[in-house]
Each structure stands twice: as C-alpha cells, then as structure tokens.
C-alpha cells in the first residue's frame, strides 16, 4: 500500500469537493516521527478561496477524512498531520522486502533504451581522480537507471585520432615501454617524456601533424597498414590498463566505441556534407558552423579547408550514431566541456536529432594540490585506491576481525572500493569537491564504512538465527526507533525512481547513509537477541533482516560490496 499517494489522492478529492478545482499537492515529512509521518499546508492555500482561517479549514478537513493505513489525523496551527498505522505498515513493508529480496527497489521495465557514455579518458596515461569522479558517477547512474526499469548500454568513446594519441605513437618509436609497469602507466611515462622532447625540439611538431593526417587518410580510405597497426596497438595497450582500474572499482562498459570507426564508415564525411547543405557553414581559415539561430555567438569549427575532419565533426557523427540507437542518451562530462556540449547538441538539433542529456561534474582534488597529466604530476586512481586499501587494512588489523592476511586483504579491498566510490558519489556532481581521507574512511559518521559496518552488525545478529516467526509481527506499541527504520526501509523504490528521474546518484548515497544511521539508533535502543518477549524479538529480527537486504540492494546501486565482517 502506497500510503503517501493515498493521502495525496484523498486530499485532491477533498479540495475538488470544497472548491470545484484541482490543486497540486505535495506532502512534507515532519522533522520528528512523533509530529506525524506526513504533513500538508493546503489549508493556507485554500484560505483565500474558502474565506476562512487556515486553522479552521485544517480542523474541518482533518475531522472529515478517513484514509486506509492512517491511524489518526491531527490539525495543528493550520497544518494537517497524518500518523500511519505502524503495525500494519511494518508487516506489509517487511513482507514485501522479504519476498522480493534482491529485487526490492527495482521498478517495472519501461521498454526504453538509454545509451550512457562515461569515463572516455584519452588513452595517453592512467586515470587521474578527475576521471574517477566521472566513472563513479557514471557507473552509479547506470545501475540506478537499470533498477528504475531502463535498458541501459554504457559506452566508452575512445579518442584514437587526436594529437595526444599521435604523441604516444611517436613516443613509442623513441622511448622503450616499461613492460614491468601497468600498461596505462607505462604509456603515460612515454607520453610525458615525448612532451618534454617536443618542447625542446619544436621542429618535431610537424611529424606529429603528419602522423595525425596519415592516420586519418588511412582510416578514410579503409586501409590497414603499419601506421594504423601502431595506433591500434598503442590504444589497445592503454585500454588494457584502463580496464584493470575500472574492474577493480566494479565498473564495466558494454561497448568501447573508437572515434576512427566514424571516419572509416564514411559517416564523418556524410555529416560534413549534410551540414554544408544547411547553408549555415561559413569559411575563413576553416569551415565553421553558424548556430546563431540557437542563440549561440560562438561557431562550431567543423573541418579544415582541405576537408579533413576535426574532433568536433567526429563527435557529432558519434552522437548521431547514439541517437539512432536509443530513446535517449546521457553523457557524463566535466564542467569545462559545457560550451562544447551545447554546440554539439545544437548541431544535432539542426540535423533533426534529439539532444543528448548531459550530467556535468566539477573538479575534484586532494588536499595535497592539483593534477596535470601532461607534466606527469597527478594522483592516479590506482594510487588513490592502493592508499585507500592500505589505510583500510591497517584499520582491519586494529579491529582484529580477520583470521589471516588473505582475509585482511579481501576485507580491505571491499572497504577501499566503498571508501573511494561512496566518498565521490555522495557529493552532488555540480559541486567542486576535495577528497579527504578522514571522511572516506570514517567509521563513525559519513563514510561508507559506517554503512558497511551496519551491514556487518546485521549479519552478526542473524548468524545463529535459523528462522524468524511471522506470528503476530509488530502486534505491540512500537517505539520511535523501530518506526523510523521501517519507514526508511520502505522508501527504497521511491528513492530509485527519484534518483533516476533527476539523474542524481547522490540521492541514493544519502539515503543509504540515513538507513545505516537509522539502524544504528535502533540497535542502540532496541534489544534484539536479548529481548524476552517473543513477538517483539521476532519483529526486531525481521527489521534486522530487512535492513540487511536494503543495505545490500542500495550499495549495489553504487557498485559497492559488503565485507561481511568489520
């Protein structure tokens, strides 16, 4: 039973009865459960039409309503507060979670396909923590969209045609790859050394331009030769390292789409022709697309005068390919790409395609300072993860919960993944963030270990419980801690729906912390195994069991596993 929607429907009917018109109604949740579960201020909105004081209107409405699942309705200073029948609500919530298990929180299939592009870092060095923010938000959003009923395909757009990759190919001829190192790190070292070489020998720049031009010509002609093989090998080598990092963080892409595919297929050439035919292309030192009809002063640089493509043209071809194969597309991009994203979207609109949705994220840094791939000074995601794992292992040893170094390693890895992913995803993407270790590995207040520890507590309580009797569950006067946690558990499906709708995975992150904290208060104030009353004991065991399920399901939406013990 969806009590919230039932209240809204009943209130809408009441408003129509009183005024003859419809009113949009939203419910608030009072700050404390003893003030009610839901509240509305509609009496204040009706006062003018009904020519009565809000206090009187609230009392009249409260006295006239009877709603299934609501134990009582109170009018307080013009507000109408609704109190749920908790024994019935709790039985229903526990029953639903117990029967649906890992499917609790998942919504019905919508029959819509989404292409979600995230990470898409250039294959010229390891991921830094800026890429980490992209991949964590992107993968969490993918999981949430799937849970909300969408068919989601995740794509990684591989930039194999840019200047950066030409520098890597050029560098591979002059510097030896350190095969003892992780592939993307070895490539990154070559990239840094080659940049130094280019800075000291400007005449070599022409060789980079020649590599780019010759690679594009070969792709356009559909030729595979020694040069295309060099580009392919360099990119594949780097991607191998990328996939290791992604896998460590439980991130997997459905498809890696290479930029050169759209040159080889002739699609880029076709896009340039179609845009030329719009009459919106102007020529100076390059071809530019005039998008002033869309309120944009800046023109999109479309192609060189010799007709060869640029990144922007290939990006448009890629987006057309996406739009032709999905109901809608979502891109994860850094805030510094806002103008480019608008230019690409308006070009799509000009050609008659839907625009891609974009989730922008701001920069992330460590207290130690900034990052720069080109100069070779940055914090890689691999380093961040290893540091998290090392700190987590130290904490696990201190707590003495593991029997062997192997078990310490296993637990520490899950804590580290949780620390990194959760600390990134809990902050709204549009806010700049500083990654702080004392928050990421906080076992007391805001870190993922708080949530994982609550789950470990549930597991420990249930360890020797063979079965939980359903007889007379919640047939007693429940206290506020019990009511609060049950109400929180019931919210998961709506949390998933809302997070998917507004594309904000931090909603799920904040919710799961609320569940963990709500459970900890319940645990501190409600004896479970030591409770002598069997009805209360079984009811509380049911709360523990369903909390465990909700914590597992919710952290799975964020790509985080449970260590089991901590």
Curated annotation (Swiss-Prot):
Entry's EC annotation: 6.1.1.19
Enzyme class: ligase
Gene Ontology CC entries for this record: cytoplasm
Keywords per UniProt: Aminoacyl-tRNA synthetase, ATP-binding, Cytoplasm, Ligase, Nucleotide-binding, Protein biosynthesis
Coarse class of the protein's main subcellular location: cytoplasm
Membrane spanning residue stretches: none
Reactions the enzyme catalyzes: tRNA(Arg) + L-arginine + ATP = L-arginyl-tRNA(Arg) + AMP + diphosphate
A Gene Ontology BP annotation from the UniProt entry: arginyl-tRNA aminoacylation
Pfam families: Arg_tRNA_synt_N, DALR_1, tRNA-synt_1d
Alphabetized CDD domains for the sequence: ArgRS_core
GO molecular function terms attached to this record: arginine-tRNA ligase activity; ATP binding
SMART domains: Arg_tRNA_synt_N (SM01016), DALR_1 (SM00836)
Keyword Aminoacyl-tRNA synthetase: yes
Motif ('HIGH' region): 121-131
Compartments (UniProt record): Cytoplasm
Family to which the UniProt record says this protein belongs: Belongs to the class-I aminoacyl-tRNA synthetase family.
HAMAP family hit by this protein: Arg_tRNA_synth
Protein name per the record: Arginine--tRNA ligase
Gene: argS
